[in-house]
Design a protein with these regions (language model features):
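Alpha-helical scaffold segments that mediate packing/assembly in large oligomeric complexes
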Residues: 1-33, 42-62
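Short, well-ordered loop/turn elements at secondary-structure boundaries
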Residues: 35-37, 160
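Sequence/fold signature of self-assembling virion shell proteins
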Residues: 3, 7-9, 15-18, 58-187
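A structural signal for short, well-ordered beta-strand segments and their strand-loop junctions
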Residues: 39-44, 90-92
């Protein structure tokens, strides 16, 4: 119920026939039926390129423009989504290197993720091994920095040696998971 998959001429890679505004509205309506107000859509650069090439998005813009010609660009696409649907488009462009050293996108080219306003979850700090060890050791000097980085300093004798260990346990939570909607717009 939080996932919609487009097929055939509805896919956003079919620039002549696709209607991304109507598809986004369908997802927004599904969320509203559950009491969720969506505020943002995360997409890849390739998806943004498909939106720029969409004839229906161009027609939405032309319908509000007194001139017969427009230059379609990312800013116009973002503007029409904001004005028509109150959705901010976020293009996620970051890459990582895979095991073969090739650049890979974090965000897939086939998906659009719709998000509500605000935080999707929290960070929770757990008891780290250093904290646990400090509870039972009198020889360790343990301090906590910022929100959960633990620093343990121990002294060893013969030979004289100072050992410093740093650790932290951070666990993400996803309380707003039921407020996130996915649209698979391309194969």
């Amino acid at each position: 119920e939080h996932f919609v998959e487009l097929t055939g001429t509805d896919m956003w890679s079919d620039h002549e026939n696709c209607d991304p505004i109507a598809d986004a509205q369908m997802v927004i309506d599904k969320a509203l039926a559950k009491g969720v107000i969506l505020k943002a859509m995360v997409i890849s650069p390739k998806t943004m390129s498909n939106l720029v090439k969409s004839k229906k998005i161009a027609s939405y813009i032309l319908a509000q423009n007194s001139t017969a010609n427009i230059y379609m660009n990312k800013a116009r696409v973002k503007e029409v989504f904001k004005n028509e649907l109150n959705i901010e488009i976020i293009v996620y462009e970051k890459l990582f290197k895979d095991y073969d050293g090739k650049d890979k996108a974090y965000y897939p080219d086939t998906m659009a993720t719709f998000l509500p306003e605000g935080a999707l979850g929290n960070l929770w700090y757990g008891t780290s091994p250093i904290e646990r060890k400090a509870l039972g050791s009198k020889d360790a000097n343990v301090s906590q920095v910022n929100t959960g980085v633990n620093i343990m300093v121990t002294q060893e004798h013969d030979p004289e040696n100072t050992k410093t260990v740093v650790d932290e346990i951070v666990l993400p939570s996803f309380e707003c998971m039921d407020s996130v909607y996915l649209l698979k717009h391309s194969a």
